[in-house]
From Swiss-Prot:
Enzyme Commission identifier(s): 2.7.7.48, 3.6.1.-, 2.7.7.88, 2.1.1.375
Coiled coil feature spans: none
Family under the similarity heading: Belongs to the paramyxovirus L protein family.
Molecular function GO labels: ATP binding; GTPase activity; methyltransferase activity; RNA-directed RNA polymerase activity
Full protein name: RNA-directed RNA polymerase L
Known partners and oligomeric status: Interacts with the P protein.
GO cellular component: host cell cytoplasm; virion component
Length: 10
């Protein structure tokens, strides 16, 4: 999972 995906989820 990339950092962009992580930020979208949070």
């Amino acid at each position: 999972m990339d950092s962009v995906s992580v930020n979208q989820i949070l």
